[in-house]
């Protein structure tokens, strides 16, 4: 099921059987049958925290499970209430998003699982590898703070990626050394600056034409300056949000002043 206003699929949220678009915020009831073929045997699949909580409850019956994400932490004080219960051993297993990765100190946590650790590794962002390494390292640091030690299990489809290898052995310096040459060759920070320009329009062809026009003007204005590179235009990673088509381009240069 896709959002009618965005180039995004709807995310199933329970309870309530709601489909929510994380681009524009549209909330709609999930149909009982497929709107395309009419079949009624719809199987809901996913990898979110809600799905993971259901799997944990079915596999480990009898344990006390809580979930921390934007859905469960909406009410005032719910965040601290859940953490206090976990600290007092009133919760056996805590499922959550990145919000449980930072700043929490629980000496009795002996096992941490990082599910689908490389979900953000291949995003269209030059900082994706860096952020993934940071996140996995931070989450892994929640385990084994007490005298009994602990264990960390990381689920990944790319175990040989430098970010994963470095996070597995807490060697952030090794990741930095592998990442810096790539950044330098592409003029990404800290070796250069990047300006991203996004063109939005109600008509896709018009937005594309404006993006191409910008590239032509920019290319002409920096002619003879080999320190500036222009990439694009291309459809943005999310090519439509709120019925506005999106095209983007990037300008790379040695410093913000030049750009």
Residue ranges and their predicted role:
Residues 1-216, 220-221, 236-239, 247-250, ...:
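Inter-lobe coupling/hinge segments of SF2-like helicase ATPases
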Residues 225-237:
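Conserved small-domain helix->loop->beta segment predominantly found in fold-type I
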């Amino acid at each position: 099921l896709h959002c009618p206003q965005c180039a995004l699929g709807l995310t199933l949220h329970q309870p309530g059987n709601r489909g929510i678009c994380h681009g524009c915020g549209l909330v709609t009831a999930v149909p009982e049958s497929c709107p395309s073929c009419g079949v009624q045997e719809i199987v809901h699949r996913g990898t979110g925290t809600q799905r993971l909580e259901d799997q944990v409850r079915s596999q480990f019956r009898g344990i006390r499970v809580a979930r921390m994400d934007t859905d469960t932490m909406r009410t005032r004080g719910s965040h601290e209430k859940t953490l206090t219960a976990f600290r007092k051993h009133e919760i056996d297993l805590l499922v959550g998003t990145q919000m449980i990765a930072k700043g929490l100190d629980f000496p009795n946590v002996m096992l941490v699982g990082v599910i689908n650790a490389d979900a953000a590794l291949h995003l269209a962002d030059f900082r994706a590898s860096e952020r993934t390494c940071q996140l996995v390292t931070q989450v892994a640091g929640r385990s084994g703070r007490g005298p009994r030690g602990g264990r960390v299990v990381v689920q990944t489809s790319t175990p040989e990626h430098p970010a994963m290898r470095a996070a597995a052995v807490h060697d952030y310096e090794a990741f930095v050394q592998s990442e810096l040459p790539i950044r330098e060759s592409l003029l990404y920070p800290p070796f250069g600056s990047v300006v991203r320009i996004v063109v939005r329009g109600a008509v896709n062809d018009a937005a594309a034409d404006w993006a191409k026009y910008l590239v032509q003007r920019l290319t002409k204005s920096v002619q003879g300056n080999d320190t500036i590179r222009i990439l694009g235009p291309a459809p943005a990673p999310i090519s439509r949000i709120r019925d506005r088509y999106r095209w983007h381009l990037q300008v790379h240069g040695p410093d913000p002043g030049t750009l």
